[in-house]
Amino acid sequence: MTFFTYNGISSADFGLHIESKNIFSAPEYDISFQSIPGRSGDLIVSNNRFANVKVTYTVFVRRNTVEDLSDLLRAVKDWLYTEPDRYHEITDSYDSLYLRYGVISGSLDIEDQLNKVGCFTVTFNCKPYRYKKDGLLETSVTSGSSLFNPEAFSAKPLITLTGSGDFRKPAAATTKYLVRKSLSP
């Protein structure tokens, strides 16, 4: 069965069946175009970021009675609208190596068919990145080792230094990474 998880809970737990999905869309690069009188062609002004992306799942659920359907849909709404003011982890069975961070977006317009089938589209407003699950695992690196990013986009890893003694960063070294120093006495 195909499924998505949101905030640690699976759609399969509710018996939701995914009819269609839009999960592979790429985010829009945030740029604007500036026209200048007397000059052919617009200037491109980059905001140096990607906009959030919409991820949607169209789902349906069957139940034996209208009461069962109503109870289940109430539980689904409780699940999806828990903490709607923050991003939550989203995974699915279609793209199982990656996860996203998103929040429910818009309303749930639930259409009932034959009074026992509920159909609706769940839309999440997601950060523009997908995170490779194994890339979120902690990795130990020793002196002289290298870190390699296999993805096409740049990443900013969280680097934690542990050990004893003085920590010196060469004056010529520059970094855009978050470095947390944890040196024991």
Predicted regions and their residues:
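Short amphipathic alpha-helices in soluble, non-transmembrane regions
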Residues: 71-80
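Solvent-exposed edge beta-strands and adjacent loop segments
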Residues: 1-54, 97-109
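Intrinsically disordered, low-complexity segments enriched in serine, threonine, and glycine
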Residues: 132-185
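Short polybasic amphipathic segments
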Residues: 1-7, 88-90, 168-172
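Short beta-strand and beta-hairpin "edge-sheet" elements
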Residues: 86-130
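Oligomerization/assembly interface segments of phage tail-like spikes and tubes
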Residues: 42-67, 116-129
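Short helix C-cap/helix-to-loop transition motifs enriched in small/turn-promoting residues
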Residues: 79-87
